[in-house]
Structure formats: C-alpha cells, structure tokens
Amino acid sequence: MGQMEEYEELIAAARCEIEVDLLLLGGSVANLISGEVRRSDVAVHKGRIVGFECSSARQIIPLEDQILAPGFIDGHVHIESSMVTVPEYARAVVPQGTTTVIADPHEIANVWGEEGVRYILQSSRNVPLNVFVMLPSCVPATDMETAGAALGPDALVGLFEEEGVIGLAEVMNCPGVIFRDPQIMKKIQLAGGRLKDGHAPGLSGPDLSAYICAGIRSDHECTTLAEAEEKLFSGMFIMLREGSAARNLSDLLPLVTLKNSGQFLFVSDDRHPADILREGHIDFMLRKAINEGLDPIVALQISSLNAARYFGLADLGAIAPGYRADIAVLDGLDAPRVTHVFKDGRLVARDGDFLAPMNRPVKAMHKSIHLAALSRRSFEIVAEKGPARTIGIVPGQIITRSLPLFPLIREGKVVSDTDQDILKLAVVERHRATGNVGLGLVQGLGLVRGALATSVAHDSHNIVVVGTGDEEMLAAVSAVTEMDGGLVAVADGEVLASLPLPVAGLLSESHMQEVAEGIAECIDAAHKLGCDLEDPFMTLSFLSLPVIPELKLTDRGLVDAVAFRMVPLFLGGSLEDD
C-alpha cells in the first residue's frame, strides 16, 4: 500500500466509513496535549489512532475504569547495562509500559566499534519496541586505556545514514568542546541538524554556555537542584535519571513546575536487571514522581510526550488521531500499574506477561576475549618506597578516594592484606592481546579469600579482577576467558559462581530473569568470601572508569581522575600527592 492509499484508508477509518481494526472500549484517555483525562473509546486502524467515536471494529477490547496513556519513552539508556540482548530487553520492559527507548550503544561500541552499533540496530528490528540510536561520541572515552575499537569522525559518517540513528549521544568530552578540540568538533559538525545530547556533570557559568553553544541541548548528569536550575535557565532539557548506581529523581523533582515541566524527561541511563524486574522501568519513575507530589498528568507528560517532542518523534507521545497506537493502559493515576500494552495497535503485553511473537535473534559475534599469555607473575607488584596510592571505595557511589596507604610487603613484593582490607587489583587488556596489565590496590571490598573478576568494566570493558592472592586472580581471569566474558567468583582455584556474558563480554542471550538470578548467585558468592558491599560486581565495574574521580585503574596503570593524568602506584616516601 502506497502512502496516499494509506492516508485515504486512515481518513475513511477516522470518519467511521469502514470497520476499524481495533476498538478500545470503556476507558478514559489521558490526553497529554490538552492536559485532561476524559472518558473515551479509542479507535485504531493500521497501527494508528484514528479517533474516539467509531463503534464498528474487527476486535473490541473492554477497558472499563482504566486509563489509556501513551507508551512510555526512555530518553537515554545504555541497553547493555541490562546485560541482555535487545529482544530480551524488550521482553522485560514492554510489559512495564515502555514502547520507545533512545539508546546510546556506547558500551558495545567500545568492544566492537561500528559493528557493535550495527548489531544493536539490527537486533532492534522486528521487536515490539521502538529503538532509536544516538551515536556514541566518545569511543574510547580517554587515551589512557585500551578499548576494542574507536569511533572517529570517519566511522560516524556512514552510521549517521543508518535507519534508526537520530543524533549524537552524550558528549562527554566537555573540555574538548570548550577548547574546540578538532576531533570532537568534527563529530559535532557531522551531526549537523540532528540532536546532540549532553553529559556535563558540574559544568557551570561561561563554560556551560560555551558547551551549549555547540548545539548540545540536554543533560542527564545533574545531581543537585542548583545544577539543574542553572542548566534549565540556560535552556537545556533536563533528563531526570533514576538508574541503578545513579538515582537523582527525588533530588531534582522539586524543580518541576507547571510552567517549566515541558523541559523534563525521564531516563534510566544504566539500570540493571534486578532493578528492572523488581522496581520497574519508566513506570517506576512515574509512580515515584506521583508519590512525591507531582501532578499525574505532568508526570505522564514527562514519561512520554516531552521526550517525543525533544527527539522530534512527531507521531509518538500522545493518544490523538494520527499518532502511532503505542499505548500503556493503567489501573489508575494514584500509583499507576500497567495492565495492557499496545504497540502499533497490537496487544503485546497483559498483566505483566509478554505476548508478542519474537523473531529469531540476530546472530551475535562471539569470541571477544583476546588475552596475551598470563601467569601468576603477571599480577606481581614490586615494592617501592613510601605509601601507595590506593583506590578507596565509597559505598553506594561510583566515585572513589585516593588514599596514601602502606601496603603489606613480603620478600620485596606487595601482597593483599586482608587485615587492613588492602587488596590487589588488576585490569587486564582483553581486546588486542597486548599483554597490558594495570596493577593497583583497593580498599573497601572486604574480601578475606578468593577473587572476583568481570569483563564488564567501564568504559573500555577490559577484565578487572580483585583478589587475596595472585593465583586466585589468575584463576578468576582464566574463568572469565573460558566463558568468553562474564562475572565470576572463585576461591581456592574453584569457580563458586559465574554468569557467562558471551556477546561482546557484556550481554547474555538468556532471559533477563535468568541473568538476574545469575548475578544474584555471583553476589552471594562474593558475600561468602567476605565482601559486604551490596553489589560488589557493579562497584568493580566502575573502578576502571578514568573519567570519574578520584583514582581509577586502567590496563595502562593508575589514573588521577581529577588531574586527568597517569600516576605511579608509589608516592616515593611522601604522603603528599606529587
């Protein structure tokens, strides 16, 4: 059917001249454009809403006493944080009312580059979830680590032409923008009139203005009311984030008023399987916002319409004639729960059950772990004078402290000290078999025996391992390698628990429930080894992220993430940082 014929059929359906495909009967429409809730039937034809008055339909679904709202839109998400493939991600979030996500495939791009982005795009086809992609702007994140790939301007040229790509994802290199680094400016230029998302924690004053003048219109990194207020006053869209590691919704919600609410979007950023399954997705943020006093209609606008308008998705975000029939049916507005989900006019979920047929998934490229030969000696640290820069974990946060501590030394070598909780930490390069092994120390994990390792290690996703002995660390890295990526806890050379993540070392092809159970088993094993952190693997995965203060470890060594430079492990006899 050509476009003109489709328009003519939709017009006929809207005039009730022909039988429509679907009639949703007896509910009330949350009209986010007019800002009201009104009792009304909804007629759907060819995947589009065609009106409110037709009575003849091939299928009628009664929805008495329920609220029909537009399907929810997540304005910024790294799907890879869910540790499942796109089809399995859809299986989990669609029953929670999410029908559209704006994805930044930054994680898989750090492993597979262009092919990683294309894998996400291809995996997103023929699933009952709109997946629009913003191209990663900073791969690799820094030159102080070894990533699996690089996405330079030349790589972005072709990717911008791919169906489903709508802009440039979070521009993390704020100094590069402000001081006009040629590489980042070229990427911004290539984006042209497409949207450019921001990532500007703490940026303020003239630097913020300069950053915005590059065409960057949003930010999801606000953590304080004052920061969000300045960025709002400067014209930015504020993404209200409620992830797993970063939860900022409650802190920022007081800024939302009836006059400015159109500038806010809900985003999950990084949300892990257990949180999605236990709490929810955008529906969780909707309930939380309403519970904290936000008007339900405003909360629904932030859940869908605002994102649709910001991203230029003109036929999403409302229940009105001509819009796509992506609908989340709610049991009320006080603490809304999703009862039915329609995608393009098809019932795809009911009462939490996923109903849509799923096509055979795109075949993933496996074998992403490529290590040089390792031995116990790969983890040896030769002692030097003075205290050592030690990564100090801050429970519940991804920032760390840089602590000058004296490690335990035996026969001229640094060994893990379980009494002081100063453990050896290593980041093993796994993309190019370079043989790089960054060595450091960490305090706060609490292991008294064994080792933990993971191939999920932001942002370059090398293998990060912590342990009470070199043999244990080697055993943990070997176990991750044998699984072609994943999480593992070992003790006495034996694997206690593991979760294989064979897709890029980041994702499982199993259901999210199975992945969540696997993570829980790994965490439980870590707790039995002495670690008392709520999620030690999440903590471990951020110890290699050199763009977050204060001290981090990459495969190339220790990084002072405040001064943004490589530093030696030992301070050379002084307690003052050099």
Please describe what each predicted stretch is.
Residues 112-116, 142-148, 179-183, 207-211, ...:
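Short acidic, glycine/serine/threonine-rich loops at helix termini
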Residues 1-45, 94-96, 277-293, 297-578:
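Active-site microenvironment of metallo-dependent hydrolases
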Residues 27, 47, 65, 76, ...:
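Divalent metal-coordination and catalytic microenvironments
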Residues 78-82, 106-108, 136-141, 171-174, ...:
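Active-site beta-loop-alpha junctions enriched in small/polar residues
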Residues 150-169, 175-240, 246-266, 277-291, ...:
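Histidine/acidic residue-rich metal-binding segments in metalloenzymes
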Residues 74-85, 140-153, 217:
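Active-site mouth loops of central-metabolism enzymes
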Residues 2-13, 89-195, 259, 495-499:
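Divalent-metal coordination cores built from histidine and acidic residues
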